[in-house]
Amino acid sequence: GLGDVYKRQLLFRFVSSLAVSMSTVLSIVYHLEVVQLDAFQLVLVGTVQETACFLFEIPTGVVSDLYSRRRSVLIGMFLYGLGFLMEGALPWFAPVLLAQVVWGCGDTFITGALEAWIASEEKDKPIDKVFLRGSQMGQIGGVLGVVLGTLLGNINLQMPVILGGSLCLLLGLVMVRIMPETNFSPACLLYTSDA
């Protein structure tokens, strides 16, 4: 049977996808109407976020491979939450720009680390089924996040960004308590033991 790690990764995939899609579904509208960015600033915000993701990909991968996949995922979730809270609570150009770096960095901490954590913790399980179910839960959470974000955004455009960020932080706190890491070996040990 499939165990606790399987259920926890389903929870993580569902809630994280819900929170991120809730925070981002109306981001262009939020940036235009609330933050009142002009066309150049909009392009700059997108470029900074993409650049942050690119630049942090290698250093954050090192954390995952050498120190802890669990730690990498948790750091990423807290950075997502902090970035979205900053973006939603401080609707001015400079904080919104900084928020893109923060949550873009958070994204790179999670990318790859989550899959590696699942694969190492569930190594005796049918991993294709584990990943498929995780992906399905992420898609369901993402769709629900779009619906909730749109409904909340009709009330107040800051609300879905702030609530999504808060949900990321709450998920991070829950995962600190329930996310095990029992099968991790630093990558440097794996490389040297093969020699």
Outline where the language-model segments fall:
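Helix-loop boundary and gating motifs at the non-cytosolic
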Residues: 4-51
